[in-house]
Amino acid sequence: MQTLAQTNNEKELIPKSFLQSGNDLPITNEIAFKHPLVQDIFDIDKEHLGLYSEDIYYQMINVFLTDPYTYMVFLDDKGIDYESTTPFEVFCLLFVEYMEKLINISKPLEDDSFGILIKNNIYFRAFSFFFGVDSFYIKQEQDGKKTLCYDDGKFLLNDDVYNYVMEFVKRINGIPEGERINPEDEWAKQILIEDERERLKKHALKHKDDETNTNRLGNLLSTITWTCNGGVTPFNRNQLHIYDLVDGIERTSKLLNYKNTMIGVYSGCIDKKKINLNELHWAK
């Protein structure tokens, strides 16, 4: 299947200029991955006047964040080595398991309620929001590889294109690459997995009753509105693409750091010889 996704074997690099264009990410001639406006995110939960829009949005982008390293415990429980699988394979495993659980708990429901529950599951909502397709399914190709399809077999995603999408999701939402440990051997790897298992258990107990909204989007909007040069206001900020919001805050932070450092240099508190002004510059 010919796609428009251009990938790099080492890393799915997407030019910063493209991110700033606000364009959707092209997948095929018929399908693109949405680069949402802030208003698009607000509109996710129109039923409740946007009250839960932010929570739902971050649940939806989490659907596409399936780094095997992050899911090492989940994979280990299935007898899968996280170093030998791909993000797309993890996505497929999570989707299948999620749908099986959803179907099982939905069995006592009437047909109408069952249909609504299936239609509104987080995977289908995410693909409807970002791709504009109501549902999708996993197709096993003759070579054993999996493909995501929609409608009557139209191509949506495969292993390579999924990496492209995952990179786009992380870039436009300002999600950094997490730190990781590279174990020397299988013994060290198993220790790492068990340590992660314990961390997840403690995290689950600690946050069991914690339903506090982190308000990340709200904090980003507040920051860009009141610390930028005045171009972003309460009256136009909803028309920013999500990457503009993230990039604007990062650029403002660099500018403030540059100004504060230069004040330190001019006042004699910082030795100019010990800093790299080119790397420090806010326009880099």
Regions found by a protein language model. Give the residues of each.
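Hydrophobic, aromatic-lined core segments that form the binding pocket/scaffold
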Residues: E97-D210, T214
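Long, intrinsically disordered, low-complexity Ser/Thr/Pro-rich regulatory/activation regions
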Residues: V265-K284
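An amphipathic, hydrophobic-aromatic interaction surface with interspersed Lys/Arg
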Residues: M1-T85, L93, M166-M262
